[in-house]
Amino acid sequence: MTLDELIDKLAAKSRILITKVTVKDHLAYKIEPHFLLPFLKALKESEELRFTVLTDLFGVDFPKREKRFEIVYNLLSLKLNKNLIIKTNISEKESIPSAMKILSAACWYELEVYDMYGVNFNGNNDKRRILTDYDFEGHPLRKDFPLTGYTQVKYDKKLKKIAYEPVNLDIEYREFDFSSHWHSPSYILPGDEKAEK
């Protein structure tokens, strides 16, 4: 039996609705949030599969979607030496169940997703900022977060302490040409005619 057949059999046995999705060369499934914990538990406890290691958990922001946040779990089976991707989507106002009690490594990953996107995990009451400053305003990986942020942190020599102040850009935004050097730009700059000779 192939790996995807084993997973389909496990999901059917557990009455969990899953949808196979394409993620390059990886086996991946999309699942509704309320099926997430039972599915993770079944994958971990299955003697045939043993997906016991959470190698990564991250969020992605798709602001135009109704359920804008996609939470992605990367699992590893040491028994099969195979990876599995589980995806679930939630809206901005929804929360997602914490996987900490099933996969203990989820704790820090969930804190990171909370810090970067503002996604709440039910069952993980730790709301510490682990990548941003304690007084940081907002969630920086959301697509609606301003490019420059809201405040900047500087050391004030007069006060001899860290000070928060409004963002002050020392340089103006400029237009940059991001075309690769393998593809020449469609415009001609002064002096380009000399290079052709």
Swiss-Prot record:
Keywords: Cell inner membrane, Cell membrane, Membrane, NAD, Quinone, Translocase, Transport, Ubiquinone
One Pfam assignment: Complex1_30kDa
Broadest EC class assigned to this enzyme: translocase
Membrane topology annotation: Peripheral membrane protein
Family matches, as InterPro entries: NADH_DH_suC, NADH_quin_OxRdtase_su_C/D-like, NADH_UbQ_OxRdtase_30kDa_su
One MF annotation (Gene Ontology) recorded for this entry: quinone binding
Record keyword Endoplasmic reticulum present: no
Entry keyword Cell cycle: no
Catalysis performed (reactions): a quinone + NADH + 5 H(+)(in) = a quinol + NAD(+) + 4 H(+)(out)
GO cellular component terms given for this protein: plasma membrane
EC number: 7.1.1.-
Subcellular location: Cell inner membrane
Subunit-level organization: NDH-1 is composed of 14 different subunits. Subunits NuoB, C, D, E, F, and G constitute the peripheral sector of the complex.
Function, in words: NDH-1 shuttles electrons from NADH, via FMN and iron-sulfur (Fe-S) centers, to quinones in the respiratory chain. The immediate electron acceptor for the enzyme in this species is believed to be ubiquinone. Couples the redox reaction to proton translocation (for every two electrons transferred, four hydrogen ions are translocated across the cytoplasmic membrane), and thus conserves the redox energy in a proton gradient.
Family designation: Belongs to the complex I 30 kDa subunit family.
Name under which the protein is recorded: NADH-quinone oxidoreductase subunit C
